[in-house]
């Protein structure tokens, strides 16, 4: 429900405000609590007199916000002094040049009701033993003066957000008021608008071990929303814990095309967008030209290393185009760049994957879609355990590849690197 003029009283937005960003703090335990008493629904009360920190969900929300903020031109942070707001700003870590604490960004004071439960009327109007809505609104209006500097970030509370929106004449919905959402308030010819900016969604295949697991962990740690595909959902739960608002699991079998469509469909159903695809699942079985050729194994290798990435690329392409800066990362190999042995199956299919990457780049470029081959030499995983050319400690580590994948997701369209050759020993690259 929008705030009324009666709620605002004499409070008015200051002159000279420029476009700015806003985050409501991440969730706390009180945000999660509701009860019903005598048929009336009551909500947890946390105002300026309740100084509690974020719960695990709130910390995740702050991480997601940080992913968004690091790509924005934040000129400075102005934060409420309450712990939940400070923790949100700290975890989000927008990396801007200045940080201020503003008492006027505190939540409304709910007096003796703090830490308990209250009816809707307590939040919508003046209420016994609570701070006057007009006085609260005047404080918020004063805090808005910080936005006279363009692109400042305000980190505060739900009540503050509702007053800000009312002062600027902007309608907001539950989508805007959710904990941890990054909002951009912008003005054109004295008309204000607000939009939600959320962190990118990346799909990653083959994530239960090795390179794929390191990629998924790195993306999660840096505030991406991820959709993870593996043959067994329980393996995903064992590796990453239960699903949450930023983490989606789906069955993915590189030999089962229907599982790929289902995975994309459920990702869209949960997140309503796809910004990146990492084709990591691969097959390194040995098909040796100097030995008898196992045609069935060669076909399996072709299907996993080339056909599955092709189908996933085709399924995701409409959503990647819609994002305007879609990213496809194909986990290739130095074996897709040169030939150093007789393992014809792996060499052929990785060269084929390079062809897919280049074709994807050609098709997607004008739509903002960028594709990259990451081509490592020996990586310290089970797939490289057969070699005695180099020890595991000297090999590329999965975490090294994960950083390159994230870098590919974050590079601008105007300066994209289409191939990363990654070496751990002296060898030919052609």
Swiss-Prot record:
Residue numbers binding substrate: 333
Residues noted as binding NAD(+) in the record, renumbered to the chain: 203-227
Top-level taxon: Bacteria
Listed EC numbers: 1.-.-.-
Catalytic residues as annotated in Swiss-Prot or TrEMBL: 346 (proton acceptor)
Protein family: Belongs to the short-chain dehydrogenases/reductases (SDR) family.
Described purpose of this protein according to its UniProt entry: Reduces deoxy-fructosyl-glutamine to mannopine.
Name this polypeptide is given: Agropine synthesis reductase
Naturally occurring in which organism (per UniProt): Agrobacterium tumefaciens (strain 15955)
Gene (name only): mas1
């Amino acid at each position: 429900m929008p705030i009324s003029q009666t709620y605002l009283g004499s409070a008015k937005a200051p002159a000279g405000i420029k476009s700015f960003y806003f985050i409501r703090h991440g969730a706390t335990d009180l945000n999660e609590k509701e009860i019903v008493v005598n048929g009336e629904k009551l909500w947890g009360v946390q105002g300026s007199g309740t100084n509690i920190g974020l719960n695990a969900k709130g910390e995740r929300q702050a991480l997601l916000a940080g992913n968004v903020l690091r790509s924005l031109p934040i000129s400075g942070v102005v934060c409420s002094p309450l712990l939940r707001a400070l923790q949100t700003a700290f975890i989000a870590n927008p990396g801007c040049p200045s940080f201020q604490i503003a008492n006027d960004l505190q939540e409304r004071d709910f007096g003796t009701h703090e830490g308990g439960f209250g009816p809707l009327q307590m939040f919508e109007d003046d209420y016994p033993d609570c701070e006057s809505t007009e006085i609260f609104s005047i404080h918020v209006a004063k805090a808005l003066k910080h936005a006279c500097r363009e692109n400042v970030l305000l980190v505060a509370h739900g009540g503050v957000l509702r007053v800000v929106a009312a002062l600027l004449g902007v309608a907001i919905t539950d989508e805007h008021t959710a904990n941890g959402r990054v909002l951009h308030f912008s003005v054109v010819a004295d008309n204000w608008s607000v939009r939600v900016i959320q962190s990118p969604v990346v799909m990653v295949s083959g994530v239960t071990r090795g390179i794929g697991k390191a990629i998924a962990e790195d993306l999660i740690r840096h505030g991406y929303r991820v959709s993870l595909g593996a043959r067994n959902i329980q393996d995903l739960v064992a590796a990453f814990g239960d699903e949450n608002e930023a983490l989606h699991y789906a069955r993915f079998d590189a030999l089962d095309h229907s599982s790929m469509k289902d995975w994309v469909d459920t990702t869209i159903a949960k997140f309503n967008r796809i910004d990146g695809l990492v084709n990591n699942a691969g097959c390194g079985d040995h098909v040796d030209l100097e030995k008898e050729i196992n045609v069935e194994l060669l076909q399996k290798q072709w299907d996993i290393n080339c056909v599955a990435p092709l189908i996933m690329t085709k399924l995701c392409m409409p959503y990647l185009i819609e994002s305007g800066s879609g990213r496809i990362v194909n986990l290739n190999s130095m074996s897709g760049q040169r030939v150093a042995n007789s393992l014809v199956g792996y060499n052929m299919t990785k060269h084929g994957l390079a062809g897919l990457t280049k074709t994807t780049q050609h098709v997607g470029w004008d739509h903002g879609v960028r594709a990259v081959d990451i081509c490592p030499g020996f990586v310290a995983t089970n797939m490289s355990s057969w070699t005695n050319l180099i020890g595991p400690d000297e090999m590329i580590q999965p975490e090294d590849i994960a950083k390159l994948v994230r870098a590919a997701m974050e590079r601008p369209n105007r300066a994209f690197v289409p191939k990363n050759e990654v070496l751990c020993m002296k060898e030919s690259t052609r």
